[in-house]
C-alpha cells in the first residue's frame, strides 16, 4: 500500500498518494511549519582558495581515481598530525595507505596546477560507494564541505527542513517559570543513574515520559518494579527508532540492552491498563521532521527530569563512579550527558501539557499506509586498538557528584522551558545576540553547517563563528568525534570557525552552552538545522552563577582531559559488505559494531 506524503512545488502544497496528487487549500497549507527548505534564506559562501581546490579536484579526479586504493577525490583542507590546517588541498581517500609503490602509482604531493594533495583513509560511505553500494540510509549527514561540491541533484534536499504538521497544545504556554523550587544538577556517566533511580522510585501517582530511546535493562527493571508495587499510571511517547549493538559486540556499553518492543511488552504485562505507550510520527509531512529526540520525564505533576541523554546503558550506566574503587578508565566508553531534576509543579505542568499532547497526537493521527521496511545497514569493523587507546589514555579523570540548589519565596529561581518546534529559536537567538562579556563554552554532539541553512539556523551559526574569532573572548567548542569527523572539521573551517578553539570528544552527547559563568543552556537539542527547528527536543535556560558553574566545571574538565584537537584518521571503521564477511584473526583485531554506532543520534 503506498504511503501518503506532503510535497511542495511552485509554492503549492500537495498530498501525494501513490501516483495521485491532491492539492491542499491555502489556509490548510499555511499552518504547516516550518517553511519548506526549498526557500532558503542564506547560501554559505565558499572561500576562494577552497573553491580553487574543488575545481582542481574536478580536473584531476579521473587521473587520481586510476591509482591503487583510491576511492574518492574532492576538494578540502590538508591535515597535519591529525589537525586541520588552513591549506586548501585535493583530498584523496584510499582504502589503506600503501608503502613501496612505484613512482607512477603514487599519489603526487602536488598536482600539475600547483594544488597540494592530502591522502586520507576512506570513510565507510566512500568505501561502499566505491563498491557500488548506494543508499540514502548509508549517506553521510549533510555537511557543508560535501554540499558545496556535490552535483545539483545530489545536493538537493540535504538537511532540508521538511513541511511538518506539528501544532502546539491549545492554551499551553512556554513562559518563564519563577518561584520556589529545587534543582539537582548532575552528569553522566558519573551520577546519572544514582539520581534517576530515586526520581522514578518516588513516584506515587503518574509518570509522563517523552524519550528518544528506552532500552536500558536496569531502567526497565526499576520501572517494572514501580508499576508492579504501586498504582502509578505510566504514559510514554517514544521515538520510532532504536539503536542496539550486534549480538557479538560483547564490549558494547549497550550489550545487554533490550529492544523497545520487549520493554513495552514487559511493562504492559505488569501494569496493564495503567501503562500506555505510543510512537511519535516523524518524517516529511508528519508531526516532527526526523526525530522525536526529547528526553523528559514528569513525576506526579511536581518534578521534571530533563536530559541530553536517552534511557540506554550508554547514557545512563548502572555503575557508581563516585565509589573510590571505581575504574575511572571506563569513563570514556560512556556518553557525557548533562541532566537536571527540577522540583517545581509549575514547570512540571508546563512540560506535562506538551508531552500529553504529543501522546494524543500520535494516538489520534494514524499513519496513512504502511512504510516499507528499510534495508538493513551494514555492520562496521572498528580497530580494537583504537578503542583501547581511549581507555589507556583516561588519566587524571575527575568525577562530579550531584549538586542540589534550593530556592524559596524570598530568593526564587527563574527557569525558561524550551521546546522545538516551539520556541528554541526565539530564546536561543535572543541569548546569543547579546555578545558574551568574557567567555562562551559550547558542548554538543552536533555542529553541522550546511550550504543552504534556513535564515534562523544561519544566524545561529554566524553568531558562533563570530564569537569564535573574537580574540577578546574565551570561546571553546567541543563536539562529538563520531562519523565522518574529517569532513565535519573541514565544514566548520569552510564556514569560518576559528579551528584553534574547537576540540572533538568521543562519547560527547551533551547539548549545552555556558556563558560568562552565569548562564547555562542544557537539554537535548542537537545543533543541526532540523534539530533547532523541526524535531521534538527540550532544553532549559537558567541564569544562576552556581548552577552554571557546576556545568562549567564539567566542561573544563572535558576540555582538558577528554577532548582532543587532533583526530586519528587511521582508525576509520571498515564496512562489512554483504558476501565479503571476514572472520578469524580479524575478530580479534576488530570489533564489529552496528552502523548506528558511527552516526549521530
How would you label these PLM feature ranges?
Residues 1-160, 165, 170:
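Terminal presequence/propeptide segments associated with secretion/organelle targeting
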Residues 98-106, 348-350, 548-550:
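Short, conserved charged micro-motifs
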Residues 146-203, 213-434, 469-519, 525-540, ...:
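HKD-type phospholipase D/PLD-like phosphodiesterase module
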